[in-house]
Amino acid sequence: MPATCLLHTMLTLPSPSTRNLRSIQMPRARTFSSPSRYRNGFEHAGCRCQGSTLSQIYSSLGYSGLQASQVNEGYEHLIHMLGHSREAMQLEAGAGVAIREGFKVVDQFLKDVQHYYNSEAFSVDFSKPEIAAEEINQFIAKKTNDKITNMVKDLDSDTVMMLINYMYFRGKWDKPFDAQLTHKADFKVDEDTTVQVDMMKRTGRYDIYQDPVNQTTVMMVPYKGNTSMMIIFPDDGKMKELEESISRHHLKNWHDKLFRSSVDLFMPKFSITATSKLKGILEDMGVTDAFGDTADLSGLTEEVKVKVSQVVHKAVLSVDEKGTEAAAATTIEIMPMSLPDTVILNRPFLVLIVEDTTKSILFMGKITNPTE
């Protein structure tokens, strides 16, 4: 199968990021993740898994029927395509393999993860958990420009290998907000809680769609380059219904029905960090062998029988008037004379950072309280 066809297959299949949104929601709390990173983490591991362990991983990712070589080649092509967006934004994605000193790993595994997943291998002394955690955290912090720190904690001294995946995104708004228009405003967290936020304002031409069936407003706020923020803003009191029903079909339908219109957009500044332990979620999705004594990870090592103990995911996003980096250019936008739509994000909403060319979801999150 050609790489471009395979990539299309991988991107159009249901993904854990949308198919199992209910699994990762945390009521009354912020939720944030990088679906492409935790998906890549198991593609990374699946690179050399065998038998039912591999089958379960691929089934959870929507890759049933694909061979490991096809998935590897598809992901390699995806990384290449994402690389074309890097001039106008800073997008760094990669992986690492922390290996116990003296532990023998199958050479082909290291070659494959380096070639297909841009992965770096390094040795650590897991028999000294605190020192090992510090070294791994330094690796992650360096790769994410110090945005993700202290991710690894409470290491088991019996650990023989840790697979690491990271993504760092720093984008400039295509049309920045004017900081002089930012003002204090109320944000309704829930029926009992209202907080004051720094509310940004901009009037401009945006792609927008108001879904009467799902009682949701969807709009795209573009970054420079090939990346946009998709804002999903349910009507008051409809967030729970949306979270319980949202799927990849909804995202595609909304995207297809977007149209360009004048919009008065009010959006709070926010910064969000979330850490998730994904073992329970993955087990609910059918990935069980990898965590048990029946795990077949013989493609990683022939030395001893090993299993996956935990999968930890951490993601960070900051949003302000300039995006996440100051923009020096001044732009003038020609507006039609018709009255603009008004979108005021003054209650919880969902955000997705989407790479426009591949339709990859780089990050996704639920903003419940912008002040936290």
Swiss-Prot record:
InterPro entries: Serpin_CS (IPR023795), Serpin_dom (IPR023796), Serpin_fam (IPR000215), Serpin_sf (IPR036186), Serpin_sf_1 (IPR042178), Serpin_sf_2 (IPR042185)
Residues spanning the signal sequence: 1-19
Location of region: RCL: 328-347
Keywords: Glycoprotein, Protease inhibitor, Secreted, Serine protease inhibitor, Signal
Site note Reactive bond, residues: M337, S338
Primary subcellular site in the record, as a coarse category: secreted
Subcellular location: Secreted
Pfam families tied to this protein: Serpin
GO cellular component, one term: extracellular space
Annotated glycosylation sites: N214, N226
UniProt GO molecular function: serine-type endopeptidase inhibitor activity
Domain comment (free text): The reactive center loop (RCL) extends out from the body of the protein and directs binding to the target protease. The protease cleaves the serpin at the reactive site within the RCL, establishing a covalent linkage between the serpin reactive site and the active site of the protease. The resulting inactive serpin-protease complex is highly stable.
Family, similarity comment: Belongs to the serpin family.
The protein, known as: Alpha-1-antitrypsin homolog
Organism name: Cyprinus carpio (Common carp)
